[in-house]
Amino acid sequence: MKLFVHLSIFFSILFITLPSSYSCTENDKNALLQIKKALGNPPLLSSWNPRTDCCTGWTGVECTNRRVTGLSVTSGEVSGQISYQIGDLVDLRTLDFSYLPHLTGNIPRTITKLKNLNTLYLKHTSLSGPIPDYISELKSLTFLDLSFNQFTGPIPGSLSQMPKLEAIQINDNKLTGSIPNSFGSFVGNVPNLYLSNNKLSGKIPESLSKYDFNAVDLSGNGFEGDAFMFFGRNKTTVRVDLSRNMFNFDLVKVKFARSIVSLDLSQNHIYGKIPPALTKLHLEHFNVSDNHLCGKIPSGGLLQTFEPSAFAHNICLCGTPLKAC
C-alpha cells in the first residue's frame, strides 16, 4: 500500500513538472509579456499572468502545437506602442491591433521576422509615421488593413511586390503623393485598392489599365486627369468610387464593365453626356452629381430609379428623375 502511495505521488509530481504538450513556449510567453508591458499593462490583458499557460485562457492568444499563431488585441484602453518583440512570435499567422485609439508609434521593423503572417490588421489606432517599405517583406500576407490611422508620407511602391495580397487597404490616413508607378507591375494577385480619404494627388498611371480590379475606392483625394484605366467592357470590376476628386474626362467615352453594381463619380470635373450603356448595368448605387455633365438622362434600365440628388448640380442634365428637357 505504501509503495502504491509513493508511486502515485512520484508520478503526480513528474506529470506536473513535465511540460504540457499544450503549453506555450517560454520564448512566446516572454514576448507576449513584453508586448503587454509596452501597451501599458492594460486591464484588457489582465489574464496574461506569467504564472499561467499563455495558450490557455490568455485573452486574444491562439496557439497551435505550443506556438502562438494568433494575437488579437482590440477595443480596449491601451496606451503604448507595438513592442519590437512582436517579431519574436515567429509562428504568428494573424495579428490584429484594432480600435485602439491610444496605440501610438510606428510599425516596428521586427515585424518582418513574421514570415508566416497572412493577416495584418492595424486599423482605427493612432499609429503614425510613414508606412514602411519593409512591410513588403511579408510575402505570405494576404490581408492588409492599415486604415483609419495617422500614417503620413507616400504610398510605398514596394506594396506591389507582395504576391498574395488581396487588398491594399490604407484608406483614412494622411498619405500624400501619387499612386506609385510600380502599381502597374503587381507580381501576383491584382489587389482591391482602398485609398480613400487621404491627401493623395496627381494622375493615375496608365499602366494600371491592364489590370482587372474587382473594387477601387479613391474617393476623397485630389486625383486629376483621366480614369479610363479602371474601366473596360471586358473587365469584371464590381465597385468603383472616384468621388470627391478632380478627375476630368468625357464620360461618354468610358466603356463600362457589365459587372459594375456600384459607381460613384460625384464631385469631380467630369463632362459630356451620360452614356446609354449605363442603362444596361444592374446598378445598386449610382451617383454622378456635382460634375459638368449635360444632356438628357438615358431612359431604361435602373437610372430612373435613383433619387434626383444622384444627378444634381451638373451643367444641364435633364430628364427623369430631373426636370423634363
Curated annotation (Swiss-Prot):
Its main location: cytoplasm. InterPro entries: Leu-rich_rpt (IPR001611), LRR_dom_sf (IPR032675), LRR_N_plant-typ (IPR013210), PGIP (IPR051848). It comes from the Eukaryota. GO terms for cellular component: cytoplasm; nucleus; perinuclear region of cytoplasm; plasma membrane. The keyword Nucleus applies. Confined to flowers and inflorescences (e.g. inflorescence meristems, floral meristems, stamens and carpels). It is found in: Cytoplasm; Nucleus; Cytoplasm, Perinuclear region; Cell membrane. Induction: By shift to long days (LD). LRR repeats lie at residues 65-88, 89-114, 115-140, 142-162, 163-185, 187-211, 213-233, 234-256, 257-280, 281-305. Disruption phenotype: Delayed flowering. Gene3D superfamilies: Ribonuclease Inhibitor. Keywords: Cell membrane, Cytoplasm, Leucine-rich repeat, Membrane, Nucleus, Repeat. GO terms for biological process: long-day photoperiodism, flowering; regulation of timing of transition from vegetative to reproductive phase; vegetative to reproductive phase transition of meristem. Interacts with MADS domain transcription factors during flower development. Component of a complex made of FLOR1, VSP1 and AGAMOUS (AG). Binds directly with AG. Promotes flowering transition in long days (LD). Belongs to the polygalacturonase-inhibiting protein family. 'Flor' means flower in Spanish. This is Leucine-rich repeat protein FLOR 1. It comes from Arabidopsis thaliana.
